[in-house]
Regions:
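A short beta-strand-turn-helix
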Residues: 1-10
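Structural alpha/beta surface segment adjacent to cysteine/selenocysteine redox centers
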Residues: 13, 18, 24-110, 188, ...
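A short linear-motif detector with a strong N-terminal bias
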Residues: 20-23, 133-135
C-alpha cells in the first residue's frame, strides 16, 4: 500500500458492459486493486447497446436475445444468488470474448462458459425467461445515465445518496498495471 494524502474509499461500484474490451482491461486492474487494498467492488451493468441505439430500433430489453444485454441478464441472475458469481461471470465471459476469441454473446457459448465455471448451463435460459433480469440491468444502466454517465468503465464512489456519490468515467486501460503501479493509479483516480 502506498502512502496517500487522502482517505481512499473502501467501496466502488464498477459499471461495465461485457462487450467493451477497455472495461474488461480496467476490470483486471480493479480486481488487482481490490485484492491489494481490501476494496469492495460491486460489479454493476451499463449497456453500450442502449446508449448507442439508433432511434426507431428496438431497445435491448425488447429483443429476445441481445448481444451484450443478454450476457448482463445472466450476470444479474447470478448476482441474486451471490454477487461474487456476477464478478466471476464477467471475468469468464470477458476473458472468453477478449482473450480467447470465443463468442459468449451466443447462448450455446454462454452455456459452455457456465459449465466451465461449475454452474448449471440452464441458468442462461432461466435468466432469459425471467423478465426481472431486464429490470436489474436497466436500473444499473439508468443510474449511470442519471449521473451524467455515457460509457464504460464507469466507477461510482457511493455517498450517502446518489446526490453525493462521485462518478468517474475510466480509467480506460489497455495494459492494466499490477502491484505498486496498480496502487499508484488507484491513488490518482480516487484523488481526482
Amino acid at each position: 500500500m502506498s502512502d496517500s494524502p487522502f482517505e481512499a474509499p473502501n467501496r466502488v461500484d464498477f459499471h461495465f458492459d461485457v462487450i467493451c474490451p477497455w472495461a474488461y482491461q480496467t476490470s483486471l486492474w480493479m480486481r488487482e486493486v481490490a485484492e491489494r487494498r481490501g476494496l469492495e467492488v460491486d460489479w454493476r451493468f451499463f449497456s453500450l447497446e442502449e446508449v448507442n441505439r439508433v432511434e426507431g430500433k428496438k431497445h435491448p430489453w425488447e429483443r429476445e436475445w441481445s448481444y451484450g444485454w443478454s450476457m448482463m441478464r445472466i450476470g444479474a441472475l447470478l448476482k441474486r444468488h451471490d454477487p461474487a458469481l456476477n464478478d466471476a461471470w464477467y471475468l469468464r465471459s470477458g476473458t472468453a470474448l477478449h482473450v480467447e476469441g470465443r463468442q459468449p454473446h451466443r447462448a450455446e457459448v454462454a452455456r459452455d462458459l457456465l459449465s466451465e465455471m461449475g454452474l448449471d448451463p440452464g441458468l442462461v435460459d432461466e435468466a432469459l425467461a425471467d423478465p426481472t433480469t431486464h429490470d436489474d440491468v436497466r436500473a444499473d444502466h439508468e443510474r449511470v445515465i442519471s449521473m451524467g454517465g455515457w460509457g464504460v468503465p464507469t466507477l461510482v464512489f457511493p455517498g450517502a445518496d446518489e446526490d453525493v456519490s462521485r462518478k468517474i468515467f475510466g480509467p480506460v486501460l489497455i495494459h492494466p498495471p499490477t502491484g505498486d503501479a496498480a496502487d499508484r493509479l488507484w491513488d490518482l483516480v480516487v484523488g481526482w
